[in-house]
């Protein structure tokens, strides 16, 4: 009996961590798939309406795509901060005279979301979605509108794995403790709690 219990204990030590690791990895895979799906939706919107409008703290591109009938729900992934319940109401998008505008709403800064910013030359890990070096060295063209998915408070390990899935090893930080400046997935070095906000390039115009 003792031998059986010992075997069970050993198996638990070996198997349980692998189960949790598999679950964590599947959440990152889900996030990567959600980001990839956004690319075609943004392309569809641009084909119909042209240049995407820029966002501010209260406005979200995923709310815009939802209003335009091109998304069924807000951008939600299984890693990072989960949506508030009830959801924090963002700006309302309105289409008039050939242009989309947003008004009202509360700040979405604590929520994972989709944004559009005018590019700058800040290092990608500190640009908050306004710059990427897709080839590992070259900033985006000045004045571009940059569409990004934002995942708030991902762990360093989640951020690194997401980068590995979308960018490959060449543009992924060597450890989960470092900032990532290269490729489509960028983020600052995780904080003392091991968390960081991840910005993922979707498109630029």
Feature names for model-found ranges:
Residues 159, 174-181:
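S/T-rich, low-complexity, solvent-exposed segments of bacterial secretion/appendage proteins
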């Amino acid at each position: 009996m003792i031998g059986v219990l010992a075997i069970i204990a050993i198996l638990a030590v070996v198997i349980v961590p692998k189960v949790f690791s598999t679950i964590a990895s599947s959440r990152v895979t889900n996030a990567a798939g959600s980001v990839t799906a956004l690319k075609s939706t943004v392309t569809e919107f641009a084909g119909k309406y042209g240049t995407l409008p820029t966002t501010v703290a209260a406005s979200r591109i995923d709310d815009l795509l939802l209003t335009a009938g091109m998304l069924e729900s807000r951008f939600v992934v299984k890693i990072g901060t989960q949506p508030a319940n009830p959801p924090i109401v963002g700006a309302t998008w309105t289409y008039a005279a050939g242009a989309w505008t947003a008004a009202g709403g509360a700040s979405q800064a604590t929520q994972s979301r989709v944004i559009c910013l005018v590019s700058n030359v800040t290092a990608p890990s500190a640009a908050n979605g306004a710059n990427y070096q897709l080839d590992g060295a070259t900033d985006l063209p000045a004045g571009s509108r940059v569409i990004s998915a934002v995942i708030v408070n991902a762990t360093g390990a989640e951020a690194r794995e997401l980068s590995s899935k979308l960018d490959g090893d060449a543009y992924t930080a060597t450890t989960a403790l470092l900032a990532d400046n290269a490729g489509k997935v960028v983020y600052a070095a995780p904080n003392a709690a091991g968390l960081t906000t991840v910005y993922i390039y979707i498109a630029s115009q």
